[in-house]
Regions:
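Long, hydrophobic/aromatic-enriched structural stretches that serve as scaffold segments
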Residues: 53-95
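A short alpha->loop->secondary-structure connector
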Residues: 97-110
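A short acidic (Asp/Glu
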Residues: 12-16, 32-33, 90-98, 121-126
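Short acidic, hydrophobic short linear motifs in intrinsically disordered regions
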Residues: 208-219
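A conserved mid-domain beta-alpha-beta active-site/ligand-binding segment of alpha/beta enzyme cores
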Residues: 127-206
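Short, conserved secondary-structure transition motifs
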Residues: 113-131
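Charge-enriched amphipathic alpha-helical scaffolds
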Residues: 198-199, 220-244
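A structured, charge-rich N-terminal accessory region that forms the first stable segment of a protein
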Residues: 1-62
Length: 244
């Protein structure tokens, strides 16, 4: 079996050996394309270098090569465990990965490892140690219908056709009902709704321009379904600060 984790913070909690890879992207912002290609990664690299001062060589080695190694290893394994949370940040990554697995013809058993229900939108964050047994307990096997649904979400996400965005307005299948606020949030982003900007403006008014830390904490507490880290929130904060 092979495991793919969403981020290094999760990797540090893993206390078992095996084929473990880390996905180090945040596809919820920046340029995207339906299919992974050299141009796809080139555009992503330019975005993170400009937006987050990332190092080009480190991005290639730690992000691109890591994911390519994962896909190569997957072809030799029958079972894949994808460790991703329910929030928008993680979900967009998950949709992309499932679409790429479909693209390479992966037909093995696909497991989505979800954080304990008790942690809510905080996901794996409160969990200190993760054992191999946890990977079994928290895993949900994705049947072909579920895989197809997530693949459709990815293609809707990258589409520029507003008709495709209708998927984000529909209720998700029952096993994934928790995705409803996540899909609503993405629908609002796609359709130009100012809700997210209004949320940031409200936090600016409450905490002031120097209140980034308490504002970020409040945002995570009340709107955890976005799943944004401090870097993503800082970009939003600075953008609204420049206007206000």
């Amino acid at each position: 079996m092979v495991h793919l984790l969403n981020g290094d913070a999760l990797y540090e909690k893993i206390h078992f050996a095996g084929a473990i890879y880390v996905f180090r992207e945040a596809l919820c912002e920046g340029p995207v394309q339906p299919v992974m290609s050299e141009d796809f990664w080139s555009r992503r690299q330019s975005f993170v270098m400009t937006g987050y001062s990332a190092n080009a060589q480190e991005y290639t080695e730690n992000t691109v090569r890591e994911f390519e190694s994962f896909l190569s290893d997957v072809s030799k394994k029958q079972t894949v465990f994808l460790w991703f949370e329910w929030d928008l940040f993680c979900q967009v990554n998950l949709w992309f990965i499932i679409a790429q697995l479909r693209r390479i013809g992966y037909s093995g058993e696909l497991h989505w490892v979800q954080p304990p229900e008790a942690t809510g939108w905080r996901g794996f964050g409160p969990v200190e140690i993760i054992t191999y047994q946890d990977s079994i307990t928290w895993a949900q096997v994705l049947d072909p219908e579920s895989v197809n649904y997530f693949q459709k979400l990815w293609y809707a996400y990258v589409s520029t056709d507003a008709a495709d965005w209708d998927l984000f307005s529909q209720d998700p299948p029952e096993p994934f009902s928790k995705l409803k606020p996540v899909l609503n949030a993405e629908r609002d982003r796609k359709t130009g709704c100012m809700k997210l900007h209004q949320l940031i403006d409200g936090l600016l008014n409450k905490h002031g321009k120097d209140g980034f830390i308490p504002a970020f904490r409040a945002f995570c507490k009340d709107h955890g379904y976005y799943g944004f880290g401090d870097l993503q929130f800082k970009r939003l904060w600075d953008g609204r600060l420049a206007i206000n």
